[in-house]
Amino acid sequence: MELLLSGCEAIEGEPSNVLCHNLHTGTLVSTFRQSSPAKNATCTTLNHLLSAQHTRPQLNIHNFGKEILDQSIILPEILICVQSSPCGSWLAAGTEKGNLYIWSLKSGALIYFFRAHYQPLTILKFSNDGMVLFTASNDGDVFAWLISTLVDQNSTFETSNSSVKAISHFSGHKRSIVSMEIGPGPIVSGRLYTASEDNTIRIWDVSTGNLLTTIALPSTPSCMTVDPSERVVYVGNEKGIIWIPLYTGSSTFSNNVKEKKRVTSVDNTTIPNAIGGMGRVVDYNDSRESSIISCQSPITTLTVSFDASLLISGDKDGNVLVWDSVSRQVLRRLVQYYSPVSFLQCKVDKISFYSNSSLSFPVLKRMITNEYLNSDVRICIQDDGVEQLMQPENILKISSDIVTQGSESSWRAKAETSEMQLKEAKRLFYELKQIHQALWEKYLQK
């Protein structure tokens, strides 16, 4: 069963609820009261719903087995964005001062906090493998932080905050970043999507930090989401929803009006061409597959279902609509809130709606202490060599080795050596074959 969690902004101090619907039938499954979800400040773990309050330093916790508020935790300062790791071990939070907090969800200990940006943080995203944390802010920059470095006990207690350095820096946007998405799969082969108030969407290669494509939009985006196969980017703005295909086979994106890419086909099968690339700037309407669906109210948030067959939108009037991603028609309206929709999330994992006292959420500490070093909670941080793989100098070194070793004379020498080795292998094979034939004939004569 695929569930949809949705919520709206709190108005005039009145708390709002988060509703849980069956995405495919529209049936109301559960209600989580007084959660007051804020945009980019609400997330879920395996057993809990977390929502940070924008008006006070407080984090509301809901157990999926209870409809009422489970607990409220007082925080060091007001959080404007939160995100939990896919493994359920870490909670990252950003503040208006640009501070980044890292808590352990196993013990509640404050592991680390430091000044990550000079301006307020807007969005936090973990990679799908949980190895890297991406932070975006009003300054238009995105930093990638290695989790194993942020939560390492040695770096926490034996070094200063200034020693923590991002493994990648994505810069180029001129204004605040309003939405950010990470492509599926391992982080070393993933892509990063950022939407900014400068009316552009930028697609980055995570491992190298290079800009792949810039998509120019007709107006300022308010939200963005990408389907799990990275085929289409959905953008919401004040006029409606924009479908932007990342691959096209009929009328492709071009760098200018006169130049058009040819459609490649093999056996009457069209091979899709990726838009942009090599840092090119393309316009959203350069493809026939792209389109704008007008809506009566400005779009505030978007998400897609597990198989990308459904697109779910929330607007300023409080409508939560389910769209068919192929026909681009509205299938149903799940709910209408009294304020703008601020939170949408699809969950495929089975959620237990039965109360369980053993699933209590730990109290988040407000200060860094060494108490958790002596606790019984131990987390093994696996070193997959992500930091080394994502270093640009390594890639440049590999490229230089290919260039230096790829001269014509060296390739000719390698080809001659391979040919001689092949001839020698054939000669030995024929000798061995003759010996085997002689032994076989001798055996038959007995």
Swiss-Prot record:
Disulfide bonds: none annotated. Keywords: Chromosome, Nucleus, Repeat, Ribosome biogenesis, rRNA processing, Transcription, Transcription regulation, WD repeat. WD repeats lie at residues 74-113, 116-155, 172-214, 216-257, 294-333. InterPro entries: G-protein_beta_WD-40_rep, WD40/YVTN_repeat-like_dom_sf, WD40_repeat_CS, WD40_repeat_dom_sf, WD40_rpt, WDR18/Ipi3/RID3. It is found in: Nucleus; Chromosome. The keyword tRNA processing does not apply. Its main location: nucleus. GO terms for biological process: DNA-templated DNA replication; rRNA processing. PROSITE patterns: WD_REPEATS_1, WD_REPEATS_2, WD_REPEATS_REGION. One of its GO terms (cellular component) is rixosome complex. Belongs to the WD repeat IPI3/WDR18 family. Required for both pre-rRNA processing and heterochromatic gene silencing. Component of the RIX1 complex, composed of ipi1, rix1/ipi2 and crb3/ipi3 in a 1:2:2 stoichiometry. The complex interacts (via rix1) with mdn1 (via its hexameric AAA ATPase ring) and the pre-60S ribosome particles. Interacts with rix1, gcr3 and Las1. This is Pre-rRNA-processing protein crb3/ipi3. The gene is crb3.
